[in-house]
Regions:
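Short loop/beta submotifs within extracellular cysteine-rich repeat domains
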Residues: 19, 30-31, 63-64, 75-76, ...
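Beta-strand C-termini and the immediately following turn/loop, strongest in propeller blades
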Residues: 12-16, 56-60, 101-106, 149-154, ...
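Cellulosome-associated attachment modules in secreted, modular CAZymes
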Residues: 305-374
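Repeated scaffold domains used in trafficking and secretory/extracellular systems
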Residues: 1-4, 39-48, 84-93, 132-142, ...
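Entry beta-strands of beta-propeller and related beta-repeat scaffolds
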Residues: 7-11, 51-55, 96-100, 144-148, ...
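Trp- and S/T/G-rich repeat-edge/linker motifs of beta-rich repeat architectures
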Residues: 20-39, 68-84, 115-131, 163-177, ...
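Blade-level signature of beta-propeller repeat domains, shared across WD40, Kelch, NHL, RCC1
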Residues: 272-306
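Structural motif
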Residues: 17-22, 61-67, 107-114, 155-161, ...
Length: 374
């Protein structure tokens, strides 16, 4: 399950011997957009980059494959094939390039990261190995920054984050507690969320320079989390918490101002779920998961009063700051475009247009906030 930059949502359905890409229509019907893939895709990861669907998967021998659906040629096209066993792997895109991480070889698992350039068709390793033995990692990318959250088996299984800004990896130990899985998600401005599961680990909001802010989980969830599945919608962080407890699989929302959590909507499932994935579009959150030998897709419509629209918050991080003014300047200079959601927030004066007047209003509000804080 993946959502493109234009809001179009796609779903990859796999069987033991085939796979088909579908578009999830506005009425939740599925339209096949690819021919069936011939072969097996194990543990597939789907992303949409510049309108093209890419899938990272493992074959029967746990070798990594990156392929794409070639719309013009109406065929599945292989982009990259690994040469060593890859027990763990994950895929992300910043909208221009693809980034994937994988472990190589049998135990111990060396952790590596690669960048695939769709224009050249070449995949190159990013820097050097991140760890001599790691697992349970995820990767995210935005605004020129790449982050990998992983469980470092060389350091008592603690959660770590590796941040790459185009030069070197900055590796940060997030906690001294053991963790299980580590999930990550990127905001449009290149800031990230890193969510280690297990123990009493908090989750972390991280900036490009590695500065981390911790948010504790509710007491009832501490030491009871198998996996956290994040998604961003309307400037808010939502997390589906998988405890592999048949009593509840719930969705939570973090209130950053109060550092508190609240459940959202009804319980997603009252059974043990596997391979849950979240995606969001147009104020609706979708969850796909495997349970009782079925693949299920459910949705939750976030009401207007729950989705707070913060005027001027162009990068959707829940705050108005210098980063928003920089993005606004770039938009006025026509070096970037805004999504529909960003456009709603850019029209601060509400006169039917987005122009310099809206930017002036934003700068004044930020200045007044700085004066009050001082």
């Amino acid at each position: 399950l993946a959502t493109a930059a234009d809001g179009t949502m796609y779903l990859l359905s796999t069987t033991a011997y085939s796979a088909t890409l579908y578009r999830v229509e506005e009425d939740e019907t599925l339209t096949a957009v690819s021919k069936p893939f011939s072969g097996s895709m194990y543990n597939p990861k789907l992303v949409i980059c510049d309108g093209t669907a890419y899938v990272l998967y493992q074959d029967y021998d746990y070798i990594s494959h990156l392929c794409k659906w070639n719309e013009n040629g109406q065929l599945w096209e292989e982009c990259y094939v690994g040469t060593k066993l890859a027990q763990y792997q994950d895929l992300a895109t910043d909208g221009e390039q693809l980034y994937f991480t994988c472990t190589t070889g049998s135990f111990p698992y060396a952790l590596q990261a690669y960048c695939y350039n769709p224009n050249t068709g070449q995949a190159t390793q990013i820097g050097t190995d991140l760890s001599g033995n790691a697992c349970n990692m995820e990767i995210a990318a935005a605004d020129g920054t790449v982050v990998i959250g992983y469980r470092d088996l060389t350091a008592n299984s603690v959660p770590k984050a590796a941040i790459y800004n185009g030069a070197t990896w900055n590796i940060i130990t997030l906690s001294e507690q053991e963790c299980g899985m580590v999930s990550v998600i990127a905001e449009e401005d290149g800031n990230f969320w890193v969510l280690p599961s297990g123990g009493k680990n908090p989750i972390f909001s991280m900036s490009k320079d590695g500065t981390a802010t911790a948010y504790e989980l509710p007491a009832a969830l501490q030491e009871n989390v198998f996996q956290m599945v994040p998604v961003l919608s309307g400037g808010n962080l939502y997390v589906a918490v998988n405890s592999q407890n048949p009593n509840a699989f719930d969705l939570y929302r973090l209130n950053q101002e109060t550092a508190s959590w609240e459940t959202v909507g009804n319980t997603i499932a009252n059974e043990i779920v596997n391979q849950p994935v979240l995606s969001a579009r147009n104020g609706t959150i979708y969850c796909m998961y495997n349970a009782s030998e079925q693949i299920l897709l459910k949705k939750l419509v976030i009401s207007k009063n729950e989705e707070t629209i913060l005027k001027g918050d162009l990068n959707l991080d829940g705050r108005r700051n210098l980063a928003d003014t920089v993005l606004f300047h770039r938009y006025l200079l026509r070096t970037v475009t805004l999504t529909e959601e960003q456009g709603k927030r850019a029209e601060t004066v509400e006169d039917g247009t987005i122009n310099i007047i809206d930017l002036i209003w934003l700068k004044q509000v930020i200045h007044l906030a700085d004066v009050v804080d001082a």
